[in-house]
Amino acid sequence: AMGLNKENRLPLWVKPVRKISPKQVFDAMRDHYEGTPMDMTQDIGAGGHGLPYRWRPMNFEVDGKTYLNERATATQQTGFWLCGQAREGKTGILWFGMDDAATSCLTPIYCNTTAVPECMAEGNGSMLDYTDSSAFWLFNRVTNFAYLRYDMMSADIRKVVDYWENAMLENVKATDAKMAGLSTKAQKKIATEYSIDKANELFASWSRLDKYLLLKYVDGNLKSE
C-alpha cells in the first residue's frame, strides 16, 4: 500500500474471515486510512484539528520534488453515496446518503419505492442554487462546518450517525414483516411511505444537529453540554 514494493500488488478484493454486517460496510465507506501509516488525520497536512482532507490541487512541491496527496475512501466532493443490500426473500434496500460519507448518514430506501423524498428530489436545489429544503445542502452545511474543527465535531456527528443507522437496521425489520404476504401493489405503497417518512425524519434530525453544532462551537469556543 505504501508503494515500497511495486511487484507485490494488492489484490482487487479479499474474502472476509467472518460474516460482515451492513453497518460494517457502511463504516468502511468512511475510511481515511485511520490506524495505518497513511492515516490522513496524523500528518502535517491535517493541521491542528486532524482534518483527513487535502484541498485541491492534490499535488505540491517541496525542495524541488513533487508530491501527491492520497485520495481516501471518504472524500469531500461527494454528491451522494450508497450501499445496496440484496436480501434473500425480501425487498432490497438502497441505503442512501448525501455528501461526505464520513460525516453523513445513510437512510433506507426500499428498491420498490415509487416516489422520491422531496428533500432528495431532482430540481430541489443545485450546485448553483442553495435551498433550505435540500438534503444535499443541509448535509453540506454540517460537514463543511465540521471541517473547521474536525477532531471535535466529527465525534459529535458520529454519535448521531451511529444512533440513526443502528436504529434503522432494526426498524426495517418491522416494515419487512408488515409487507410480508401482501400484494405487490400494497408492498410498494408501504415501502414508498416508509422510505419517504424516514428520509424526512433524517432531514429533521440533521437540521437539529446543524443548530446544535453552531451553538456548541460558535466563535471558536467550546460550550459544555
What function would you assign to each model-found segment?
Residues 1-225:
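C-terminus-biased signal that marks the final domain/tail of proteins
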